[in-house]
A protein has these predicted regions:
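Conserved N-terminal beta1-alpha1 strand-loop-helix module at the mouth
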Residues: 1-69, 79-88, 93-103, 136-139, ...
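Conserved residues at the C-terminal ends of beta-strands
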Residues: 30, 73, 108, 165
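Charged helix-capping and loop-helix junction motifs
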Residues: 40-45, 120-128
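Non-cysteine beta-strand/loop elements that form the S-adenosyl-L-methionine
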Residues: 103-111
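A short acidic, helix-capping loop that chelates divalent metal ions and anchors anionic groups
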Residues: 111-117
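Active-site-adjacent loop and "lid" segments of alpha/beta metabolic enzymes
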Residues: 117-120, 141
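Short, glycine/charged-rich "phosphate-handling" switch motifs in NTP-dependent
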Residues: 160
Length: 202
């Protein structure tokens, strides 16, 4: 999940907490308009939420704000900083070919994005799959992903995961939205566990 406090229906820390409870395990902290001190404080608030669920907070930009994970834009910096986890935004085969020591890439936009109107043209799953086959690192699909069906199509195209912004940030219930989007990743065992939990609640 990527953050955008301007689209969130409530406080960002609350949204992230609910999303993590719903199954999100990676959060990319954007909020690049904040002063560094405020952004670092926000990162410090979010890290324990992710850590408690075995998740990871990734900071957008080369400065990990005291952490060990960063997500870089397509244009730089090169070489990537030496951190525990480094990802990069990519949009075409040329950008994927420039990857060196990155651990993963996002490829976008897969679908038209309400968060970035006019951003595109959208790749759609077929072209996404072609780029994934060219990528030297695992790929997360990004852009306009709002339904479980879209998630499933990205996974079937070869994505190891999806990066979602608006579908969770704008949701009345971020936890419920996150859980719905996670359904395509569930195994038969996790479906059984969830059903058993629901039965006990009933």
């Amino acid at each position: 999940m990527l953050t955008d406090r301007w689209q969130a229906r409530r406080g960002l820390v609350d949204v992230v907490g609910a999303a993590v409870a719903g199954g999100v395990r990676w959060v990319v902290l954007r909020e690049k308009d904040l002063p560094r001190a405020e952004r670092a404080a926000l990162a410090a608030d979010l890290r324990p939420i992710l850590a408690g669920a075995g998740g990871t907070l990734v900071v957008a930009g080369p400065d990990p704000l005291g952490g060990d994970a960063a997500h870089l834009p397509a244009a730089g910096p090169y070489p990537p900083p030496r951190l525990g986890l480094v990802g990069r935004s990519c949009h075409d085969a040329a950008e994927l070919a420039r990857l060196t020591t990155e651990d993963y890439a996002t490829v976008s936009p897969v679908y038209p994005s309400r968060s970035k109107p006019g951003y595109g043209p959208p790749l759609r799953p077929a072209r996404l799959g072609g780029l994934i086959r060219l990528s030297p690192v695992p790929v997360l699909a990004l852009g306009g992903i709002e339904t479980p069906g879209q998630v499933r199509a990205c996974v079937e195209a070869g994505a190891v995961g999806v990066a979602v912004l608006g579908a969770i940030m704008r949701a009345d219930d971020p936890g419920e939205a996150a859980a719905a989007l996670a359904i395509p990743f569930e195994t038969p065992q996790t479906r059984h566990d969830h059903a058993a939990t629901a039965g006990r609640r009933g």
